[in-house]
């Protein structure tokens, strides 16, 4: 079983992790419903590309 020969230092570990970044989700304005929604996904009111395709989610 392979084991590291040397312990990875905090600096080395943190330099490697500098590329792990959180990006903001892409949000578009839906003119049909007047709400903002994520791209390429059905809105909460059941619309996709301006067409009704699903029943709206029930409010609990």
Swiss-Prot record:
Keywords annotated in UniProt: Ribonucleoprotein, Ribosomal protein
Keyword Isomerase: no
GO cellular component: large ribosomal subunit
GO biological process, one term: translation
Gene Ontology terms, MF aspect: structural constituent of ribosome
Family stated for the protein in its record: Belongs to the bacterial ribosomal protein bL32 family.
PANTHER family recorded: 50S RIBOSOMAL PROTEIN L32 (PTHR35534), LARGE RIBOSOMAL SUBUNIT PROTEIN BL32 (PTHR35534:SF1)
HAMAP family membership: Ribosomal_bL32
NCBIfam families, per the entry: rpmF_bact
Protein name: Large ribosomal subunit protein bL32
Protein's organism: Streptococcus sanguinis (strain SK36)
Lineage: Bacteria, Bacillati, Bacillota, Bacilli, Lactobacillales
Gene: rpmF
């Amino acid at each position: 079983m392979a084991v590291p020969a040397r312990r990875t230092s905090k600096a080395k570990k943190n330099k490697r992790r500098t590329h792990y970044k959180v990006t903001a989700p892409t949000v578009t304005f839906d003119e049909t419903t007047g709400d903002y929604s994520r791209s390429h996904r059905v809105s909460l009111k059941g619309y996709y590309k301006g067409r009704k395709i699903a029943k709206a989610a029930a409010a609990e």
